[in-house]
């Protein structure tokens, strides 16, 4: 289990996780929260309790791959491969499995209903004919509501070295190194990070699981030699203090690495990050 890798589906530029076990492992062991974006067709306007899939930011996805716990799956190509390799016998077998599952669920429901009837009749001292616990296998059922296992994960596990899977270099070609290093440095020290758009920053940092704690920091990353306007320093400090948080900025010093040529991505990813916190004294 410890060596198991979980697939991250790459769908139209988004990183999605469809496995509940993966969501649990990412959150518990790697402090990766993600954002649940799944909604029920019957309740398209719901915005409180969303479900799978879970969408990952580019930083979260790259962090999990760098830790060796995940790999990228090109979802479009995998589904095309599945359709091309699916035979009529596979379709028949799938329908047969769903119909068998429908029988089992219906019998279980009838059994539970009969048990309730027996309990009620015992209290009344009467007997009542019960519904038979069987169905004609030739009866037709609406199978659209019967759940089926997705095969995307199994295909991904079997074909992890296949050409149908995206190269990480292509997927993360435009990764912002400074932003990622800031993200990584905080997660590695035990923080949980969420998107910080609502507070006008890159990330919001929590000292523990976001379901149990309030966020402590508004996080922004900068290049080492990047000039930060004084107005930004004042605005960031005032905003952080106003919402009872601290504005945290930071960056990595890459001036002394590979001065004679272009810096490699591998060299940049090893750089340490320095952090600076800013508060607005006597305000808020």
UniProtKB/Swiss-Prot annotation:
A UniProt-annotated Pfam family: tRNA_int_endo
Enzyme category, top tier: lyase
GO biological processes: tRNA-type intron splice site recognition and cleavage
Matching PANTHER family: TRNA-SPLICING ENDONUCLEASE SUBUNIT SEN34 (PTHR13070:SF0), TRNA-SPLICING ENDONUCLEASE SUBUNIT SEN34-RELATED (PTHR13070)
Similarity remark: Belongs to the tRNA-intron endonuclease family.
Subunit-level organization: Heterotetramer composed of sen2, sen15, sen34 and sen54. Interacts directly with sen15.
Protein name: Probable tRNA-splicing endonuclease subunit sen34
Organism (species): Schizosaccharomyces pombe (strain 972 / ATCC 24843) (Fission yeast)
């Amino acid at each position: 289990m410890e060596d198991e890798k979980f697939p991250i589906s790459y769908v139209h530029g988004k990183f999605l996780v469809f496995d509940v076990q993966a969501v649990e492992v990412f959150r518990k062991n790697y402090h990766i929260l993600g954002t649940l974006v799944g909604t029920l067709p019957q309740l398209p306007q719901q915005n409180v309790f969303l479900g799978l899939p879970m969408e990952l930011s580019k930083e979260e996805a790259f962090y999990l791959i760098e830790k060796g716990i995940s790999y990228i799956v090109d979802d479009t190509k995998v589904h095309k491969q599945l359709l091309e390799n699916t035979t009529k016998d596979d379709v028949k077998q799938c329908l047969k499995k769903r119909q068998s599952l429908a029988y089992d669920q219906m019998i279980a429901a009838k059994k539970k209903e009969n048990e309730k009837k027996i309990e009620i009749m015992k209290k009344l001292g009467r007997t009542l004919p019960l519904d038979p616990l069987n169905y004609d296998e030739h009866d037709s059922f609406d199978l659209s509501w019967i759940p089926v296992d997705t095969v995307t994960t199994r295909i991904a596990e079997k074909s992890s070295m296949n050409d149908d899977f995206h190269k990480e270099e292509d997927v993360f070609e435009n990764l912002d190194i400074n932003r990622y290093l800031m993200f990584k440095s905080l997660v590695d020290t035990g923080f949980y990070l969420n998107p910080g758009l609502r507070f006008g920053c890159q990330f919001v940092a929590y000292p523990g699981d976001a379901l149990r704690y309030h966020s402590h920091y508004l996080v922004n990353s900068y290049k080492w030699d990047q000039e930060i306007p004084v107005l930004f320093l004042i605005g960031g400090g005032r905003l952080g203090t106003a919402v009872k948080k601290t504005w945290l900025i930071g960056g990595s010093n890459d001036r002394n690495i590979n001065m004679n040529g272009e810096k490699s991505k591998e060299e940049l990813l090893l750089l340490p990050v320095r952090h600076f916190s800013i508060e607005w004294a006597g305000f808020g």
